[in-house]
């Protein structure tokens, strides 16, 4: 079963409180999501493999550690996932970026893929899928389905807030995908919104309604 990592780091929790705050404006909201994305990336990549390399300092030669040849890709779920992407790239600037676009079918209420663009050598990459919210889990599950169909093997999912229902659904659908969460919330309400949540992340990021 996939591991669920809920971050209690003081900086993450401090910034998340302002992200949740209704009065936080678009500019500050965007900056905070970027910052938390960067802080979370530090923890999400904690188990990346390192290789020994020989380097020369101004004083002497030594054996140092560098990331192994495994390639990393960040995949935001459009559109809200874009808000977390730059923060991750600040920590891993060499990472490639894929995109997955999903919309909800008005009749079935199921997510439908309308766009997907991935880096080459997909089988050789570690993927970090990012989306600010994990509510029912439908979008995350479909995005990961899309990656696996294209050959992805190692996938992690990273979000700001999650409902227990979404975590359970994602674990059931993809027990091999670890889940990284800044805030695990109480529940979904009758309309499928995370409670207490942070509102509509996409609208708050881009100043739309």
From Swiss-Prot:
Binds 1 Mg(2+) ion per subunit. The magnesium is bound as Mg-PRPP. Pathway: Pyrimidine metabolism; UMP biosynthesis via salvage pathway; UMP from uracil: step 1/1. 5-phospho-alpha-D-ribose 1-diphosphate binds at residues 79, 104, 131-139, 200. Keywords: Allosteric enzyme, Glycosyltransferase, GTP-binding, Magnesium, Nucleotide-binding, Transferase. Allosterically activated by GTP. Its EC number is 2.4.2.9. Pfam families: UPRTase. Uracil binds at residues 194, 199-201. Disulfide bonds: none annotated. GO terms for biological process: UMP salvage; uracil salvage. The keyword Transmembrane does not apply. GO terms for molecular function: GTP binding; magnesium ion binding; uracil phosphoribosyltransferase activity. The keyword Phosphoprotein does not apply. InterPro entries: PRibTrfase_dom, PRTase-like, Upp_B, UPRTase/APRTase, Ura_phspho_trans. It is an enzyme of class 2 (transferase). Its cofactor is Mg(2+). It catalyses: UMP + diphosphate = 5-phospho-alpha-D-ribose 1-diphosphate + uracil. HAMAP family: Upp_B. Belongs to the UPRTase family. Catalyzes the conversion of uracil and 5-phospho-alpha-D-ribose 1-diphosphate (PRPP) to UMP and diphosphate. This is Uracil phosphoribosyltransferase. It comes from Macrococcus caseolyticus (strain JCSC5402) (Macrococcoides caseolyticum).
């Amino acid at each position: 079963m996939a591991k669920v990592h809920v971050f209690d780091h003081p900086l993450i929790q401090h910034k998340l409180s302002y992200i949740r705050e209704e009065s936080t404006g678009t500019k500050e909201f965007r900056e905070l999501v970027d910052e938390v994305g960067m802080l979370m990336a530090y923890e999400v990549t904690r188990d990346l493999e390192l290789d020994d390399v020989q380097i020369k300092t101004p004083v002497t030669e030594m054996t140092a550690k560098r990331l192994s040849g495994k390639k990393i890709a960040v995949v935001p779920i459009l559109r809200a996932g874009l808000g977390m992407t730059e923060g991750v790239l600040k920590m891993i600037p060499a990472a490639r970026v894929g995109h997955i676009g999903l919309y909800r079918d008005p009749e079935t209420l199921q997510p439908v893929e309308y766009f997907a663009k991935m880096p080459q050598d997909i089988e050789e990459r570690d993927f970090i899928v990012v989306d600010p919210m994990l509510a029912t889990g439908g979008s995350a599950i479909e995005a990961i389905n899309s990656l696996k169909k294209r050959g992805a093997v190692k996938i992690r999912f990273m979000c700001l807030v999650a409902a227990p229902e979404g975590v359970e659904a994602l674990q059931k659908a993809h027990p091999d995908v670890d889940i990284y969460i800044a805030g695990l919330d109480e529940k979904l309400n009758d309309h499928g919104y995370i409670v207490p949540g942070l509102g509509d992340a996409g609208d708050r990021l881009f100043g739309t309604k």
